[in-house]
């Protein structure tokens, strides 16, 4: 009997969050280990489908770095990275677009639909969903100055066609977006999936942005998880060496999204089963929440 009571208590804990998020939009960046482990893939699919069944508009933006690396290797194309960004020439861009839109996107959509969802795959080129311009990466020179470097067909999102996403949401569909953008002349751009998720969340004025990662969240210098960060503390935490390395662009993405109108953003551990539900429907969550 006790375990039944505990289940009831869990449902009651979720109730205020269900009320809060019903009719609102949540944007989830799906990537990392959660995309390769079968149990985690199923867990993620069921989480997203449950959110949609509760009246929560859920938008998925996926990555695909490992799949791109594998295919480039098969084609004998060697990748170069500048500050974590893949240098993307025309040949590399062809592979990136093929893998993200023709392979990974279809796999994610298929998995959601297989488990009872109504997912629709999109790339940023569909309906000019993600209008982009070339992103010039800043690189520190020997004298300490910053120089902007052209790294090929790598894009920054300048406009999101939110009407396309909202049309799908109103039709009870789950939009699944591949991070390939389009330029003014129709050229394709490789766009960081975290950046896409943040821009989409900002355009939709989402209630929450969630980034799935392969770490617990933001940790302090003692290695302990920081459950919450307010916006004003972010510069201090970066300058103080608490937020470092690859976590800096993720946190910056969350900050930018909040500045664009997103209520809250979370960086969570995608290696945890049902991490999305635990983050949204429990009092403590499973990662680091960033808020005003």
UniProtKB/Swiss-Prot annotation:
Places the protein is found: Cytoplasm
Pathway(s): Amino-acid biosynthesis; L-arginine biosynthesis; N(2)-acetyl-L-ornithine from L-glutamate: step 2/4
Main location: cytoplasm
Annotated catalysed reactions: N-acetyl-L-glutamate + ATP = N-acetyl-L-glutamyl 5-phosphate + ADP
GO biological process: arginine biosynthetic process via ornithine; L-arginine biosynthetic process
Function: Catalyzes the ATP-dependent phosphorylation of N-acetyl-L-glutamate.
InterPro entries: AceGlu_kinase-like_sf, AcgluKinase_fam, ArgB, Asp/Glu/Uridylate_kinase, Glu/AcGlu_kinase, NAGK-C
GO CC annotation terms, alphabetical: cytoplasm
Protein name in the entry: Acetylglutamate kinase
Single GO MF descriptor: ATP binding
Pfam families in the record: AA_kinase (PF00696)
EC number of the protein: 2.7.2.8
Family listed: Belongs to the acetylglutamate kinase family. ArgB subfamily.
